[in-house]
Structures are given as C-alpha cells and as structure tokens.
Amino acid sequence: MTAPVRRVPDVVYGEVPGYRPLELDLYLPREDRPVPVIVLVHGGGWRHGSRRHPLPVLGADFYDRLAAQGFAVAAIDYRLSGEARFPAPLDDVRTAIGWVGEHAAGYGLDTGGIFLWGDSAGGHLALLAALTGATAHGVVAWFPVTDLARLPSDVADAGGVPDPGPGSREALLLGAPASSVPGLAREASPVSHASAAAPPVLLMHGAADDLVPPAQSIRLAEALHAAGATAELELVPGATHMWNGASDTDGIVRRSVEFLRTVTPQAGAR
C-alpha cells in the first residue's frame, strides 16, 4: 500500500537580496506520524534545471511516487551559474536544509531523518553540503561530480570530449577554469572533504557515463573508505549519464530508497 500525497508548491525557503526568491515544492505523504524528508537537488551542470523537472527516464510523477513510499520530498531550486558563482548554490542547499529543520513541526517532518538526494550537479551539491557540516543523516548521489580538477581528464579517459576552458560547466560554476583556481576547485570538490564524520553515502553511477565518468564516484568512495566513513558504490552496467541505457531504472530507485531505510530503519517504514 502507498500513501496518498499532498503537494505544497512554491514555498519560499530563502531570500537573498538582488536575486529571485528561492523556492521549493513539498510532496507530503498523508501519515499520522512525523515522516523523514528527502531534500532533492536537481542536476543540470549547475547552469540548467529546475525543481519541477525530474530525470526524463523517471517520469514527471517521480517525486509523488517517492513521497508515496513514506518520505516527504522537498524538491528545491537553487541559484544557477548564470546567476551567481560558487559557493552560492551550496549556500542555497544549506539554507533549504535549515528551512526543513525550522519548519518540520508545521509539515509533520521528522528531523531525525533528513536525507539529501541529487543527480549530477545536484549530487555534487548534496554531497558537498553533507560533507561540510550541513544536517544530513544520509546521502544518495547519482552520477555526481566529486573532483572538479580531475573532471576533464576523467572525461578524456572515458572516451568523452573534455572542455577545460572558460565556457565549461565547472568554469561557469567557479568563475574560472578549475586549473586556474586550484584552491577554489578543491574547496568545491566533495572528495576534498571526506572524513570519518561523513554521513552514510550511496553513490550510483552509470558504468558507461562519459559526461561525468564513474571515476568521479569511485574516487570519492575510496576517499570516504580511507577516512573511515560509510560509503556504498554501485556501477550500473550499460548506463550513461542521466540513466540513459539503464535496463532497470525502477531497480535503481528501489536500491536508493532501501539504502535510506537501512540508514535509519524507521525511515519511510510502511
């Protein structure tokens, strides 16, 4: 049995002078108890994307289906690279997490189960927030960027076409190519912040991804393991970026949900 879902759209979770209001949409299961919440961070190379557009292979009702399994979902927008440079989008994710904690009682949210979930650029931001002290009891990151400095070489090694120049996605995020601002690139890379204090992390990556190669997830998993943290890594055979080519996207979602339930056994319990 799945729970019916209530939507609360266009909630302003933050306001930064000079910028558009920062908004999220809530998807709430109708439960008689506080429910864990997933802060969902969309991808798009830090320059595109919206809280209203899940990955195409998952369908437009993905957030409703996720919430129907007993999790509240807070799908957030954040400032894109055409609006503001790093660390602006990271600051926005942190602000959204703070909003969830502050407003949990009013929406029936369990602050003992705040999870981050993101894909691609959103996975990068979710990981970075969790690894730099934001409240997170677990992270699901799908095909995330984890090491900005090595992204061009990883793309080349995977048979893709690297773009190390000033118009690249990472240069637009940082304000300059990663090679020109190595200190900032390190600060903006989740792999630089691996520590024993990290929450449990699930990394899932297409084995055939040449846009954000699996080496990015492998490297972070190794760094987290070396630091004594809990990290699980799964490479999906045949899958490229955005789960194109994956034979079982429903299975990928199930694996991700079960990970969160394992991290906090009461999370999303049906």
Predicted regions and their residues:
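Alpha/beta-hydrolase superfamily serine-hydrolase fold, recognizing
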Residues: 1-270
